[in-house]
Amino acid sequence: MIKLLYPEFWQKRNIIAYLLLPISLIYQFLGYLRASLARPIMLPAKVICVGNCSVGGTGKTQIVMYLAKLLKARNVSFVIVTKAYGSNLKSATTIHQGHTALEAGDEGVILAKYGAVIATKSIKEIVPLINELKPDTIIVDDFLQNPYFHKDFTIVSVDSQRLFGNGFLIPAGPLRQYPNKVLDAADLIFLVSSHQDKIPNILTPYVNKLINAQIVPANNIDKTKNYFAFSGIGNPERFFATLKNYGLNITGYKIFPDHYNYLQADLENLYSLAKEHNATLVTTRKDHVKFNDLNNNIVCLDVELSINNPDLLNEKIFKKAQIFN
């Protein structure tokens, strides 16, 4: 898998974005061809699909965690299906908490705390495992653009700062799909890390299905120390902003590509940088799980989702067509 940082021209158009537009048109055509030829299968349970329109972190994992806790509280049996990013998986596998990030992907390891998880690179491969587990509901993480399975309920996650970037498709921009059609079809839209009262203009037509959400710290960290922060996630800027908003003194940063698999040399370099800054290393849970027993001196900031209108979420999920009754 190609691992890229989020380039500046994905947010603000420049000559590079325009030069890449012909490739974006090819990407668009291939996506259309794929969707038109697909024959979606019906999975043997009701499906909640969580995804986004663009590349980069938009809070999908935290939404999936929130949904898992919500369904568990309602005694609804469920399985989480996640892409095996950064793993060496060859086929769909049921994940347990003993798996490493290399075996299951960073998201698979994290989500295994919340319920049964299947990590896969192909939706069709999960059917035998779903038949074994027999859940009432399947929470599918990050397969929104996959046309090969039926979705009963879709949630689109939107980052409140990046929104839809420069409006171009990959690689000229960050978009996997143009947003209007996706937002029209969505059952719910999460505007993540939104601390603003004003709704972005592009989302005002969807206010009746819009949920404002924040990514907030879920554990206590010593605020008297200095910290050197690093991450290899889709939206590192949001992580760094969360650290500052939490009140930590951040003396330096280092950004790695999304789903980066750290080497021993990376760890040694990070410890050296932290020593230069008289600081302790701090990172995300997605990064932390990749260090196994080597991470004893690295502080991890756990985060969770906080939403302003949970009643809307409950109403939409549990009442729409009574799909979970």
From Swiss-Prot:
Q: Which residues bind ATP?
A: 54-61
Q: Which UniProt keywords apply?
A: ATP-binding, Kinase, Lipid A biosynthesis, Lipid biosynthesis, Lipid metabolism, Nucleotide-binding, Transferase
Q: What class of enzyme is it?
A: transferase
- Disulphide bond pairs: none
- Please name the InterPro entries in this protein's record: LpxK, P-loop_NTPase
Q: What is its EC number?
A: 2.7.1.130
Which reaction is the catalytic activity of this chain? Answer: a lipid A disaccharide + ATP = a lipid IVA + ADP + H(+)
| One GO location term (cellular component) | plasma membrane
Involved pathway(s):
Glycolipid biosynthesis; lipid IV(A) biosynthesis; lipid IV(A) from (3R)-3-hydroxytetradecanoyl-[acyl-carrier-protein] and UDP-N-acetyl-alpha-D-glucosamine: step 6/6
User: Which molecular function GO terms apply here?
Assistant: ATP binding; tetraacyldisaccharide 4'-kinase activity
- Give the UniProt record's GO annotations in the biological process aspect: lipid A biosynthetic process; lipopolysaccharide core region biosynthetic process
Instruction: Spell out the NCBIfam families in the cross-references.
Output: lpxK
The record's comment on protein family reads: Belongs to the LpxK family.
Supply the HAMAP family for this chain: LpxK
Q: So what does this one do?
A: Transfers the gamma-phosphate of ATP to the 4'-position of a tetraacyldisaccharide 1-phosphate intermediate (termed DS-1-P) to form tetraacyldisaccharide 1,4'-bis-phosphate (lipid IVA).
User: What is the recorded name of this protein?
Assistant: Tetraacyldisaccharide 4'-kinase
Q: Which organism encodes this protein?
A: Rickettsia montanensis
